[in-house]
């Protein structure tokens, strides 16, 4: 897949949930090149560069778009809040196979996985995870 001329992406958190996010971003043409986590991961299936803990590498992260790849809602929100004050808002990860009505309102830092459907007038807030084949009907 062709990549865009946008900044490369650094992910925050690098385990199971991150692998899904990376696949979505790659499918959408984004280049994912680095990650932040509490420590370097021995298992690095996407061969990403380890930048360090996100709180220690704010200046390094400025050359990237970022996405918080943490499944825990509270921790993900904390990462969004902390990093947004230095880096702007996180990007969205939307799989190309998702069906999204033009009237859907979306926050930032959301994940919409493969084959998800978001129907008219749906509102998705910041950091929401819509997993594989999620279906959200109208006006929800």
Predicted regions and their residues:
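Hydrophobic, well-ordered beta-alpha structural blocks that scaffold small-molecule cofactor pockets
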Residues: 1-45, 51-59
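A general structural motif
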Residues: 6-7, 32, 63, 87, ...
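Left-handed beta-helix
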Residues: 96, 101-102, 107-108, 112-114, ...
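Generic structural signal for conserved hydrophobic packing positions in ordered secondary structure
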Residues: 13, 66, 90, 137-138
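Short amphipathic alpha-helical segments
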Residues: 22-25, 78-82, 124-125
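Short, flexible hinge/linker loops that cap or flank conserved catalytic cores
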Residues: 2-3, 60, 104, 122
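Short alpha-helical
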Residues: 16-17, 74-75, 105, 136
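Phosphate-bearing ligand-interacting subdomains
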Residues: 40-100
């Amino acid at each position: 897949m062709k990549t865009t001329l946008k900044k490369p992406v650094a992910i925050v958190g690098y385990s199971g949930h991150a692998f899904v996010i990376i696949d979505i971003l790659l499918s959408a043409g984004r280049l994912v090149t680095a990650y932040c986590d509490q420590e370097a991961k021995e298992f690095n299936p996407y061969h990403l560069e380890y930048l360090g803990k996100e709180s220690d590498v704010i200046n390094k992260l400025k050359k990237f778009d970022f996405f918080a790849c943490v499944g825990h809602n509270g921790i993900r929100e904390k990462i969004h809040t902390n990093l947004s004050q230095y880096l702007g808002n996180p990007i969205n990860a939307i799989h190309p196979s998702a069906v999204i009505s033009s009237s859907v309102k979306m926050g930032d830092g959301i994940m919409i996985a493969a084959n998800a459907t978001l129907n008219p007038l749906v509102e998705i807030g910041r950091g929401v995870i819509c997993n594989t084949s999620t279906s959200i009907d109208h006006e929800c």
